[in-house]
């Protein structure tokens, strides 16, 4: 059973989004996603300063099972990346919602956050996938 924090927003591709309250968000992959991937061995991080649209690829996460592209859930400018993942990619497995964050984004449209799933809707999505 995956852990799903109530204070986050989610995507149907299993990314989480934390509203930092200042027009920026922190983004990572969910507990469900890291469980499905298995042991993460590499995270390809984007360059800061890049402006991307929602749905664009921003990186790659590789595990012992597979490599998966990471897609931006919201449009904006990448303002920070979690460089500690370069030396310790397993942090995504150990602590996906805190130390395992991947990027921080300055939102192009802060109201777009409302279009993402809340914890209840994401829990229903995960439950449906597990059935």
Swiss-Prot record:
Keyword Ribonucleoprotein: no
N6-lipoyllysine modification, residue list: 65
Textual note on the cofactor: Binds 1 lipoyl cofactor covalently.
SUPFAM superfamilies assigned to the protein according to its UniProt record, in alphabetical order: Single hybrid motif
Pfam families membership: GCV_H (PF01597)
Any Gene Ontology CC annotation: cytosol
Superkingdom in the source lineage: Bacteria
NCBIfam families reported for this sequence: gcvH, PRK01202.1
Protein name in UniProt: Glycine cleavage system H protein
Organism classification: Bacteria, Pseudomonadati, Pseudomonadota, Gammaproteobacteria, Oceanospirillales
Gene designation: gcvH
